């Protein structure tokens, strides 16, 4: 089977999510080690990244692929070359998969139009971040006792939803898995599509706990993407939308895609608390992204056959 682009989780159903996470569990157990031998994976990261970039590289290497890393500073994009021309170049040089991180929403979909290689969306501006949502589901499912136990779990997505590509992937993925969701954000940080999602909108972390949330999915306040004043002040924002130690008394699990701004969306002493799934989310990155690379290159189907 040939290349399969991996751009979004919109339209992905519960069965498809289960299959991907089962494959990730197999990858974690080592069943895909060396399976990408002879394949070339290009990591084209044109926006800053730590967790996503490192875990994709570790995943590709663990699966046996040859890995090429490209950044804006080290590529002809710094000389004015377009994204399309860069992608075509990587494709013609023989990349089997192009893992793309880009500051513009829709960049991965654009790249996929011009590449025969599989394009994997590693985050495109305020657009999508599908592999993050998958590793979040993987981590949460393990914490509740398995994928089937996700049905009926109540989770609140808290913070800067407007600028969050993670939220735009987490929301459809969690809903497809049966998780009940609510949004917790000031009106100035809600996107237009929030009305289409049809989810309850709450005004504080305290209200989310009253709603019955057992999971608080915290989002970073993305001040670098803001074009104007969206909140009165960081202190005022944290008063309503930050999770502190007192919230842990309700027995909630805390999640965050990273990077964490300690003291803004999460109190510093909560990040590594036993109630925090953040370390588990990071650890899940290699297995989940190994599964995505195996699916994108067609190797997973070949091994299964």
UniProtKB/Swiss-Prot annotation:
Q: Which positions does UniProt annotate for carbamoyl phosphate binding?
A: 51-52, 101, 129, 132, 258-259
InterPro entries named among the record's database cross-references: Asp/Orn_carbamoyltranf_P-bd, Asp/Orn_carbamoylTrfase, Asp/Orn_carbamoylTrfase_sf, Asp_carbamoyltransf, Asp_carbamoyltransf_Asp/Orn-bd
Transmembrane segment boundaries: none
Q: Which residues bind L-aspartate?
A: 79, 165, 220
Q: Which reaction does it catalyse?
A: carbamoyl phosphate + L-aspartate = N-carbamoyl-L-aspartate + phosphate + H(+)
| Record keywords, A-Z | Pyrimidine biosynthesis, Transferase
One annotated GO biological process: 'de novo' pyrimidine nucleobase biosynthetic process
Q: Which domain of life is it from?
A: Bacteria
The pathway where this protein functions is: Pyrimidine metabolism; UMP biosynthesis via de novo pathway; (S)-dihydroorotate from bicarbonate: step 2/3
Which EC numbers does the record give?
2.1.3.2
Q: Which SUPFAM superfamilies match?
A: Aspartate/ornithine carbamoyltransferase
Q: Which GO terms describe its cellular component?
A: cytosol
The protein's matches in Gene3D superfamilies, at most eight in alphabetical order, are given as: Aspartate/ornithine carbamoyltransferase
Q: Which GO terms describe its molecular function?
A: amino acid binding; aspartate carbamoyltransferase activity
Q: Which enzyme class, named as a word? A: transferase
- What task does this protein carry out? Catalyzes the condensation of carbamoyl phosphate and aspartate to form carbamoyl aspartate and inorganic phosphate, the committed step in the de novo pyrimidine nucleotide biosynthesis pathway.
What protein family is recorded? Belongs to the aspartate/ornithine carbamoyltransferase superfamily. ATCase family.
NCBIfam families from the UniProt entry: asp_carb_tr (TIGR00670), PRK00856.1 (NF002032)
What does the subunit comment say?
A: Heterododecamer (2C3:3R2) of six catalytic PyrB chains organized as two trimers (C3), and six regulatory PyrI chains organized as three dimers (R2).
In its UniProt entry, what is this protein called?
Aspartate carbamoyltransferase catalytic subunit
